Amino acid sequence: NGRRYTTYGCSPPVT
């Protein structure tokens, strides 16, 4: 789990 968001892991793009 972590490829449908960004490159963090399993968290949405919460820059």
From Swiss-Prot:
Domain of life: Eukaryota
Further comment found in the protein's record: On the 2D-gel the determined pI of this unknown protein is: 5.6, its MW is: 18.4 kDa.
Top-level taxonomy: Eukaryota, Viridiplantae, Streptophyta, Embryophyta, Tracheophyta
Protein name: Unknown protein from spot 406 of 2D-PAGE of etiolated coleoptile
